Structures are given as C-alpha cells and as structure tokens.
C-alpha cells in the first residue's frame, strides 16, 4: 500500500536527465500504477443503504434473522429499524450539524441522536473503480464524471487514503477519501468525495458532516448478504447475553 516518495523523486530526476541527454529511456512515457487500495476496490458499486443494496425488500428476512440472533425475535424488527435509521439520513453538512451537533473526530461518543447519510451525492447512482480511474454514472447510465486519481495523503486515525484527480477539475469529484474496507475483507467499501480535502477529514463537522458512503459491488448478492450480517453483528453483538 505504501509508495517510497524519495525513491520516486530520485527516479523522476534521473529520467529527466536522461531525456535531456537524448536517451531512448527518457523518451518513454512513464505510466503511474494504481495503489494497492485502488486495485483492491476495483469493481462497480451501488450504495449499500439503497433500494439497489441492503434496503431492497428481498433482504428483509435476512435482516430480521440476523438481528434475532442477538436480541431475540420479539425485538428484531425494532433493532433493524434503528440500525437502518442510523444510516439513512437525509441531510449533511451545516443542516446536519444544526440537527445533531458538531463533534471533532477525537470525540468517540455516538450515544446521542444522529443519522449518517450513506448514499452517493451529486447525481451519482453507481461508481466504477478500474485501476486509477473512477467513473460515476447516474440512474440512467449517463456519465457524471470520469477521472484518474493519484494518492496525495493518508489519515492514520481512520486508515484513510486521499486521492486527487489528475485532470485539474475543481468540483465535488476533485478528491476521494477511501477507507480501508475492501470487498475481500468486509464485503463493502466506505468512501467520501468532494472539493475540499480538509473538510473530507471531519466526520461530524463542516461541509461533509454526517456523510459517509457505504457501497457494495453491483449485482453481487453474496457481498450484500455478508455485509448485512457483518453490520448487524458489529451493532448488536453487545446485546447478546
């Protein structure tokens, strides 16, 4: 997952010198390789908490069955409703902060009332990751954006990696924040995108407060089912006696 910065700089300097000397190697175009995380998340995704994902009625029985393992059949329906409600928010940013409060990342208290909006924004219905390229399409399949992205930073607290578009666009698809989750490990991915890299770092403050996308691979029922089971376990295992 890591790229040696100093080695890259030295290599670029050497290539530049060889190009000035007329070396054939200097004329060759250098191709950036995707990071390990970019490779691991390759695929086409839909929002996990959407009718294309875990909110579809076909998953209702699984939600109830999994919840019943931890809280019993009598309380399963209520538990599922609460879990879904936490991730089906309808507002983000300043509106969400007014509603739920502003909290720094080092505040780990989530006991109060809150909702996260976990869906795509800005007209995106599906995201496709292929190598260094990220493409978003709307519900009709029309392209919303498509750019290649390069790693520009990391956040140790969340294990996040930040990527910036190579195309110079200044819009809500300039930066992507990818968390460590991958289909191979947790059956889903978690991410954000936007125009301000610093704002993307704040979970419950600023422009992107209370917005964190959860996504599963489109048409992959095995992933969706496994992600539901994992989500229920993480939220209800403390309730099991």
What is each stretch, according to the model?
Residues 8-17:
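Bacterial N-terminal signal peptides
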Residues 19-22, 26-28:
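Boundary at the C-terminal end of the N-terminal hydrophobic targeting segment
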Residues 26, 51, 100-241:
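Calycin-type beta-barrel ligand-binding domains and close structural analogs
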Residues 27-46:
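N-terminal helix-cap/turn-to-beta initiation motif at the start of protein domains
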Residues 50-87:
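Internal, charge-rich low-complexity segments
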Residues 86-91, 97:
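Extended, polar beta-sheet/loop recognition surfaces of beta-rich domains
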């Amino acid at each position: 997952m890591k790229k040696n910065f100093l080695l890259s700089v030295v290599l670029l300097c050497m290539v530049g010198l060889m190009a000035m000397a007329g070396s054939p190697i200097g004329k060759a175009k250098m191709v950036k390789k995707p990071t390990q995380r970019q490779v691991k998340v390759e695929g086409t995704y839909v929002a996990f908490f959407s009718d294309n994902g875990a909110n579809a009625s076909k998953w209702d029985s699984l939600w109830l069955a999994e919840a019943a393992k931890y809280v019993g059949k009598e309380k399963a329906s209520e538990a599922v409703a609460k879990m879904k409600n936490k991730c089906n928010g309808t507002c983000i940013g300043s509106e969400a902060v007014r509603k739920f409060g502003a909290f720094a990342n080092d505040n780990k208290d989530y006991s109060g009332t809150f909702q996260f909006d976990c869906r795509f924004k800005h007209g995106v219905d599906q995201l496709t990751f292929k190598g260094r390229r990220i493409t978003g399409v709307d519900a009709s399949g029309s392209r919303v954006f498509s750019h290649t992205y390069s790693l520009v930073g990391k956040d140790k607290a969340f294990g996040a990696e930040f990527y910036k578009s190579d195309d110079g666009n200044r819009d809500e698809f300039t930066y992507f924040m990818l968390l460590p989750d991958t289909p191979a490990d947790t059956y889903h991915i978690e991410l954000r995108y936007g125009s301000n890299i610093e704002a993307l770092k704040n979970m419950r403050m600023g422009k992107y407060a209370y917005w964190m996308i959860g996504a599963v691979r489109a048409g992959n029922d095995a992933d969706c089912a496994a992600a539901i089971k994992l989500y229920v376990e993480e939220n209800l295992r403390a309730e099991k006696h």
